[in-house]
């Protein structure tokens, strides 16, 4: 048996106890309350989308208030006891209390009023290479410290940690540029596919026009032939002559399609 007062640590926190209130009966009760509140002055029910604030303003029993969704967080939220920020802006290392080992991106000088020349961007690749070399050097120094004075490892481990954080921050600064380049490549590929489809349709159109022109020319020759044959067949009825003309035209079309 487990000792009283002993707690067990798990990888994920247990669900909050309010899940016990999410029963089919409670859900139906909440739905009935919403239907009653949506009635108009004439007593008819109106279809309405309820917001969390509107649901909280209704007279709901305490056991049903857990079924009302909370307000959507606008700035930050908490997950597993850790506060997360909804902002997509990458915070600087100084804001996180970490020593920055590379210079910050230069900002345009607004005081001088000379905004015609843009500021030169930071050479991220150069500083990434320097940090990588510093990591190799610090690792060799760390191995040397472990072989001579293992108890003095903490300062060197902190230096290596700081170098890794700076390298990752530089890589994260490349994310917007990577997203733009990926979008450009996708749009260029889509444009190339569209141009290829247009060229294929133009080619098919030219082939169809050529076939139609050839059919029109052959049809004119067939028409003159039919007129000459009708003069020789004055005793033949028009109803008997139509199938022969159609058969001759279909023979021409079949020969064209076989080619």
UniProtKB/Swiss-Prot annotation:
Pfam families associated with the record: Med7 (PF05983)
Key words, A-Z: Activator, Nucleus, Transcription, Transcription regulation
GO molecular function: transcription coregulator activity
Basic and acidic residues composition bias: residue spans: 31-44, 230-242
Designated gene of the protein: med7
Main location: nucleus
One GO location term (cellular component): core mediator complex
Protein name stated in the entry: Mediator of RNA polymerase II transcription subunit 7
Residue ranges crossing the lipid bilayer per the database entry: none
Chain's role: Component of the Mediator complex, a coactivator involved in the regulated transcription of nearly all RNA polymerase II-dependent genes. Mediator functions as a bridge to convey information from gene-specific regulatory proteins to the basal RNA polymerase II transcription machinery. Mediator is recruited to promoters by direct interactions with regulatory proteins and serves as a scaffold for the assembly of a functional preinitiation complex with RNA polymerase II and the general transcription factors.
Subunit text: Component of the Mediator complex.
């Amino acid at each position: 048996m487990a000792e009283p007062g002993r707690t067990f640590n798990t990888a994920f926190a247990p669900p909050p106890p309010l899940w016990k209130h999410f029963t089919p009966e409670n859900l139906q009760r909440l739905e009935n309350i919403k239907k009653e509140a949506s009635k108009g002055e004439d007593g008819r029910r109106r279809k309405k989308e309820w917001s969390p604030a509107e649901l909280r303003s209704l007279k709901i029993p305490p056991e049903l208030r857990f079924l009302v969704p909370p307000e959507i967080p606008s700035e930050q939220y908490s997950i597993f006891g850790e506060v997360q920020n909804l902002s997509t802006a990458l915070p600087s290392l100084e804001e996180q209390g970490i020593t920055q080992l590379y210079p910050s991106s230069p900002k345009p000088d607004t005081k001088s009023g000379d905004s015609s020349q843009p500021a030169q961007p930071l050479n991220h690749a150069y500083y990434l290479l320097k940090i990588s070399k510093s990591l190799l050097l610090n690792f060799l120094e760390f191995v040397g410290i472990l072989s001579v004075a293992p108890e003095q490892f903490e300062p060197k481990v902190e230096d290596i940690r700081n170098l890794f954080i700076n390298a990752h921050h530089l890589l994260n600064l490349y994310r917007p540029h990577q997203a733009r380049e990926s979008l450009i490549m996708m749009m260029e590929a889509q444009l190339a596919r569209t141009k290829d489809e247009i060229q294929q349709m133009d080619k098919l159109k030219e082939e169809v026009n050529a076939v139609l022109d050839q059919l029109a020319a052959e049809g004119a020759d067939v028409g003159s032939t039919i007129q000459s044959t009708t003069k020789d067949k004055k005793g033949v009825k028009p109803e008997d002559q139509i199938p022969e003309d159609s058969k001759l035209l279909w023979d021409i079309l079949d020969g064209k399609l076989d080619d």
